[in-house]
Design a protein with these regions (language model features):
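N-proximal helix/coil linker or "cap" segments that precede and/or mark the start of modular domains
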Residues: 22-82, 95-96, 230
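A short beta-strand-turn-helix
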Residues: 79-100, 121-126
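Short pre-active-site segment immediately N-terminal to redox-active cysteine/selenocysteine motifs
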Residues: 97-100, 104-108, 141
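Structural microenvironment flanking redox-active thiols in thiol-disulfide oxidoreductases
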Residues: 114-157, 168-179
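Thiol/disulfide oxidoreductase modules built on the thioredoxin-like
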Residues: 155-158, 166-222
Length: 233
């Protein structure tokens, strides 16, 4: 934001639009653009539509086509996990056509924590959509309530419910659900997107762009929603 501090607001705005076009927005840039959108006299009906209009359509379609090729359809084992907020979350309670995004992470995993900014952007994007849920599962790590609360407070994470992966019988490794969805690996962060009892998308690692991660998650959600729309016709 150095251009803004120098009073070069037009240049700063153009730079932020460039970041949006390239899929390289940080949460700060995203919020600044939201503020600018509110001042526009002529604009699309929603901020999200305006942001989408800044991105080259051919690049967006290229990314979507790549993601379509990565859509899978693998049944997942039913699970029950303890919630950091209290109570339990059961996969049996997920509704028909509900899309559930699960982010497997750990307190010791720096890339996992770095990716949470992008996941917050995705959570905010679907904050008013009751058909999409997000859960953040502590795996391969003992959940430290004080550290989790401190991390959430420091970064102002909102509406990001933390779950605790289950322990195998006789062990203390907290990886039961993780292992059932990602057999043969132990790498995190991992994302799994679920729908109607099946894993529909999986992704490992973090590319470093918060808005790039938001786009990836939202494009997959759009693809899965389109499936439902086609089925209804």
């Amino acid at each position: 934001m150095s251009l803004e501090k120098l009073g070069k607001h037009t240049e700063a705005f153009e730079a932020m639009k460039g970041a949006a076009s390239a899929g390289q927005m940080t949460p700060v840039i995203y919020d600044k653009l939201r503020e600018h959108y509110a001042t526009l006299k002529e604009k699309p009906a929603t901020f999200e539509a305006w942001i989408a209009s800044l991105k080259p359509k051919h690049e967006v379609e290229k990314i979507k086509n790549k993601l379509r090729a990565e859509i899978i359809d693998i049944p997942f084992e039913p699970f029950v996990m303890e919630s950091h907020q209290g109570g339990k979350v059961k996969s049996a309670s997920f509704k028909k056509d509900e899309i559930v995004v699960i982010d497997f992470w750990a307190l010791w995993c720096a890339p996992c924590i770095a990716a949470l900014d992008g996941m917050q952007m995705a959570v905010d994007l679907y904050a008013n959509d009751p058909t999409v849920k997000f859960y953040f599962v502590i795996t391969q790590d003992e959940p430290n309530r004080e550290k989790i609360d401190a991390l959430w407070k420091k970064n102002d994470f909102r509406n990001m419910e933390v779950l605790y992966d289950a322990n195998p019988k006789g062990k203390n490794s907290r990886n039961v659900v993780y292992k059932s969805m990602f057999p043969g690996t132990s790498g995190i962060p991992q994302k799994a997107i679920l729908k109607n009892g099946h894993i529909r998308y999986r992704a490992e690692g973090y590319g470093g762009s918060p808005s790039g991660l938001m786009d990836e998650i939202s494009y997959v959600i759009e693809i899965l929603k389109e499936e439902g729309n086609h089925a209804e016709k």
